[in-house]
């Protein structure tokens, strides 16, 4: 199983880190089989697999349920599970209880929490043995306030992001996700941190990249961000479903090839 020290070693050797956001047993199993370094169980599962309008409806129970499934599918991959909205920021005692519950019940390698304001939480969680991945730039749980737009696009905002990144590292974060920020800013932050920096919509200057399984494979998604490249097309599965429907209605399925051949009704009738 990959560890924090191995990920740091990859950064030091300038070996790029691959990360995929996945939400269930079969997708996690595929991700591990592909040799991907890390899996993120993101609260984006709310929209992607649960049909919610946003991440706001995602609960701690949702994250635990899906985190467990992913761990079962990828026992040897570094798994990070999101703290959902409301799980951090109530009180330090409650925050740590939520973090411990998520970490223990999913058997994850780390949890992830969003925003620059969580540095005290990172310090406390680290102190009790919970590895935390920080998330700066565009933070999906805050899109109601900041909107879906490029972050760090002004001199002041860029300087603040650099400071925030240094602060979360100093607080004890084991890695950092940077989302939707300028390429040169992400590269600068990556150079100045000793922990791995994983980018999504942050250019190629980071230590690694993360994309959502469903986005990169075109699986049930209607809108994809500018930074998403499609690596396969799972939407062709709809064609298979249509063919199945046609064959059931026409009687073509199941044919003899898919039917058990043993004759039993003669025996049943002879007993009458």
Swiss-Prot record:
Matching Pfam families, A to Z? Answer: Pantoate_transf (PF02548)
Single GO molecular-function term?
3-methyl-2-oxobutanoate hydroxymethyltransferase activity
State which Enzyme Commission number(s) the record gives: 2.1.2.11
Enzyme's top EC category: transferase
Q: Where along the chain is Mg(2+) bound?
A: 43, 82, 114
Q: Which GO terms describe its biological process?
A: pantothenate biosynthetic process
**Active site feature:** 179
Can you quote the record's cofactor note? Binds 1 Mg(2+) ion per subunit.
Annotated positions binding 3-methyl-2-oxobutanoate: 43-44, 82, 112
Q: Which UniProt keywords apply?
A: Cytoplasm, Magnesium, Metal-binding, Pantothenate biosynthesis, Transferase
> What catalytic activity does the UniProt entry give for this protein?
3-methyl-2-oxobutanoate + (6R)-5,10-methylene-5,6,7,8-tetrahydrofolate + H2O = 2-dehydropantoate + (6S)-5,6,7,8-tetrahydrofolate
- The disulfide bridges present are none
One GO CC term, this protein = cytoplasm
Q: Tell me the InterPro entries matching this sequence.
A: Pantoate_hydroxy_MeTrfase, Pyrv/PenolPyrv_kinase-like_dom, Pyrv_kinase-like_dom_sf
According to its UniProt record, where is this protein located?
Cytoplasm
Pathway participation: Cofactor biosynthesis; (R)-pantothenate biosynthesis; (R)-pantoate from 3-methyl-2-oxobutanoate: step 1/2
Which prosthetic group or cofactor does it need? Answer: Mg(2+)
HAMAP family (UniProt xref): PanB
Q: What does this protein do?
A: Catalyzes the reversible reaction in which hydroxymethyl group from 5,10-methylenetetrahydrofolate is transferred onto alpha-ketoisovalerate to form ketopantoate.
Q: Outline the subunit composition.
A: Homodecamer; pentamer of dimers.
Q: What is this protein's record name? A: 3-methyl-2-oxobutanoate hydroxymethyltransferase
Species the sequence originates in? Staphylococcus aureus (strain Mu3 / ATCC 700698)
Q: Name the gene behind this protein.
A: panB
